[in-house]
Amino acid sequence: MINDGLEKLKTSYAENEIIEGEYDVSLSSKCYNGTFVGKVEDDVIAFKGIPFAKPPVGELRWKRPEKVEESKNVYQAYHNGKTPIQTEWKTERASYYRQGEDCLYLNIWVNRTCKDEARPVMVFFHGGSYGWGGTADPLYDGHNFVLSHPDIILVTVGYRTGMMGFVDLSYLEGGEDYPDAPNLGLLDQIEALRWLNQNISSFGGNKDNVTIFGESAGGGSVSILPIMDEAKGLFKRVICESGGLALTSSKEECKPFTDMLIEHSKAKSMKDLLSMSEEELMAVNEKINMYNVFPQRDGRLIPENPYHAYEEGKAKDIDILIGTNANELNYWVGELGGIIPYRFSMPIKFENDIAKLDEKNKANVKKFMKGLSGHSIWRISEFYNEIMFRLPSIRQSDDHKKNGGKTYMYYWTEPSGLKFRKACHAVELAYVFGNLDDTIYTGDRGDEQFAQTVQQMWTNFARCGNPSTDDIEWDEYTVENKETMVLCKDCHMENNIKNNQRELLSDLLDKFINPIYASLSYNVPFVWKSIIKIFLIILIIIAIILIIF
């Protein structure tokens, strides 16, 4: 049973229509594909559901996005565009909004009290393991953010996810004609940036001062875009929240997901897949959306080794602010159904993953675990915190800095009020957007002053490339000291956080560009298999007790 908020999302979809009569010109912006009329509240104009590419349907299914057609029509920009095809999931609230293939739309928030015609632009790409998420999630609403920072223009972007945005189709007959399919979601993001480059000045934005930022898969996206040739010149700065380069795939690692698509769709060729209706695709997606998909290191769009691309200076002209949360993995306590399934399933996964390592790395992991305190489940969580999130971010920062790239790092420790979550994955989003009443990850309403500090840091970085505030000096990152801003109510700088831990696990990053063994998703098979095993064991014990007594 979904709650009232999700029920409201399910029924709130509406199409933006052509405006035939009069409209308020002060609420409109003229773009090459039409004039868009927004809605105003508290002097913040929201333009929602603006198309930035042709709908990727029909012959354009699984094709790279194409430039949207020109238009002289006047359109409403009142409603979010559709959410990309995905499985409904309680914490991915956009999944309860209307879904569809036609999902390439963006939202823009502008404060009309600011008359500056060249304002910094911040473009947000949502997270969701590259398989979920959308602009309709209320957590990403930009009203409060732009109300507090009138000189900033905020944009949120929809892009194809899961089997529509990150699937290798080369294993099917005719699939050779779809070489971009494994990275379509990223190409969608680039097309949105192209549209903004051409049109954001109509909203008062400066096309030469664009900061892209994202969390989780969105953070991964904004780490990859700087090393993609097609994205060059479209943005100046990057803020990566709990993302990084670790979760990408080789061609071989993409094949199991393609095999599942073939199995459940019964398709033997691209002709078969293209003949399927949207409803049929959604039904197939329900069966395979539980598995992780990541962008593919194809050597064409994305370098085969993203770290080397940073090391070679491919992104040296981009300013980067990057960081992770202290207890990222605790997020999955909620995703996996509570502390009990988390407590029983994670050790099974950990043992399976460690069994794949060579003896040297097994010994290092064992030493790493012995150096931690607390219950074994939280020590296991700390291992995944490091290998999935923090260490890849440090490696990326080191490689970027070696070539003179301006870099800032943070470590988020402000906890969630939800039980067992601590400073979990996604907890910072309510603070960043200023949506403190949205407590889905924070549990309680966050501290207003701390939220203002975080937003000031993010927006200062977008304005000038330095996140320092009037009260807090944020030192630039160096390879030697690894200067890091600890983000909490008492923000402060620390150097070389958990240095000894990092040294023990550093070889794993060299060995595995993609620590696929360490990746988690919402319905990961190991969790349900382990839960079933536990349930069967309990049943056997109960049966034995009944027989004995």
For each feature predicted by the language model, list its residue ranges.
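Short, solvent-exposed turn/loop segments enriched in Gly/Ser/Thr/Pro and often Arg
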Residues: 160-162, 213-217, 411-419, 473-481
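Non-transmembrane alpha-helical segments in soluble domains
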Residues: 122, 153, 190-193, 197, ...
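Juxtamembrane boundary at the C-terminal end of a transmembrane helix
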Residues: 547-549
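Serine-hydrolase-like catalytic core of hydrolytic proteins
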Residues: 89, 93-270, 308-332, 402
